[in-house]
Amino acid sequence: MKLFIAAAAAVLASVLTAAPAAARSIQPIRLGGRSLALPALRGTTLGHVSPSARIDVYVRLPGRRDAELDGFVDAVTAPESPWFGRYLTPEQFGSYFGADPFRYAAAVRALQQHGFVIDELPPNRTDIVAHASAENVEAFFATPLDLRVDRGREYYTNRYLPVVPPALAGAVVSGLDDYVQFHPMLRRDPNTVIGGRFSWGPDDVAAAYELTPLYKEGLDGKGVTIANATCGAAVPSDLALFQKTFALPAAPLVSTAEPTGSHLTTACGRTSYGNGESSLDSDWATAIAREATFHQVVAAGPSNHDFDTVYSYIVNTLGHSVHVVTTSWGTCERDMKGTASLTIDEKLLTQAKAEGQHWFSASGDAGTDDCQDG
């Protein structure tokens, strides 16, 4: 289970001032002139993905001024800079840092002409969220999609590295496999007997971190929205019971399922994770930032691609309203090496900085060091 005290303190530090199993690295190999995709080197083949199966993809085009982005972020986040705090809205970000408008329109048109349905066109104007049948995806990216199994878990993957059509030149694409899976650090032990030992409640944490003086000054999260990038939705009645038990204000719980059109559920895809991590996060974020609004954005499953769409929704759609973001899901960094999602996520999190969002990754667990090797 996550060490909630450290997590709560990390989130609080940003909220009160506001107004992702290890695996060794494998390189692509070439076979018959084509480079095999990394997940195609794992496990054994089960067969072919059904031609009619829905495949969701996330496309990231190069921005016109990508080379300037890091410098801009440094300027708006450094207290000594005259640009400090002059953050962008998602629309302003897209207007300046987005892809060339003609290239962006051509990419959208090319996808539509080849059977893709456009689900979202985020305001950053570099990204495209779409889906198509497996046979259309195979034809467009010139690679078969296979079903494979590795260590008992079934997954799908593109056999070869995708061939990106000219209209998408320079783009990276996630969703062609679901091999990499995120996980929480939650551990369940419902029959634990505390005995003579002590446990921590919200007021204990507030006392330990000397938060009470801040509360008295009105620094309690009021007017701030915390977003949670998660899988398996927390239930409002559970949060209400936690708040009632500890005499906390009834902080709102807002819920959104991603991608567009998916259904909100307490299950995390086909896994057994459930919603325990989401419940823990909603309980303790609102136990510390007691007047904040908590907005959970719930992935359809635990794959890295599922979380791409969640991150995008928070950065783009919620860019106007969300001040702080927490996520307790991740995986060993080596699992992500060479994946399109790594590039996509890095770009999205840099955009988040440009918008003034503060992100915390499993701050009470291993943070960003999920390999736990430093």
Model features per residue range: what roles?
Residues M1-A8:
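Bacterial N-terminal signal peptides that target proteins for export
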Residues A13-A21:
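C-terminal segment of classical bacterial N-terminal signal peptides
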